[in-house]
Amino acid sequence: STHVVVWATVDKSLGRAAIKSFVVPRDAPGLSVARLEHKLGIKASDTAALLLEDCRIPKDNLLGTAEVNVEKGFAGVMQTFDNTRPLVAGMAIGVARAALEELRSILVDAGVEVSYETPAYNQHAAAAEFLRLEADWEAAHLLALRAAWMADNKEPNSLQASMSKAKAGRSAVDITLKAVELAGTYGYS
């Protein structure tokens, strides 16, 4: 990227209450990448530890007003997280859905029928496990939709946003690992 967004306090005596967002050019003097994280997923977006040492940014790079509102300083940062956590959840939910769809195809090809009419305990063990995974996916999906809906409608959603991100991540890991296990050698295609 050519720019990064940095949250920093504009008044050390006020601490986090004076946090503001700034756009910082990557080539700004004093900005360097201390460490680039090596991730397994979301490679289109780098995650890095940035070091700002005597990095001075013009006032024009400030996002929002220059006025320090002690009541809203840190709350603005948290609102950004509350708005983006459902998006992160959505990425995990998409990965999990793709794994479920591929698993369903593999099970069908193997002659395992998944039925929504028959109780899980009367089905093949792989079909019963698929139904459990699908229920887990549905719970994560609905929680993320709720958190996103609340954000869209300007309702406080800190709890739901945090829960949706946590639930979706755990569900995606559980679903993808179990899909690999149930698919056997096809799970590594």
Features from the language model and the residues they span:
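Alpha-helical interface subdomain recognition
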Residues: 51, 79-189
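Long, acidic (Asp/Glu-rich), low-complexity accessory segments flanking structured domains
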Residues: 53-75
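Glycine-anchored helix-breaking recognition loops at helix->coil/strand junctions
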Residues: 36-40, 66-67, 108
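Solvent-exposed alpha-helices and their adjacent loops that cap or buttress functional pockets
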Residues: 12-16, 40-44, 69-71
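Short clusters of hydrophobic/aromatic residues that line enzyme substrate/ligand-binding pockets
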Residues: 31-33, 40-42, 62-63, 77, ...
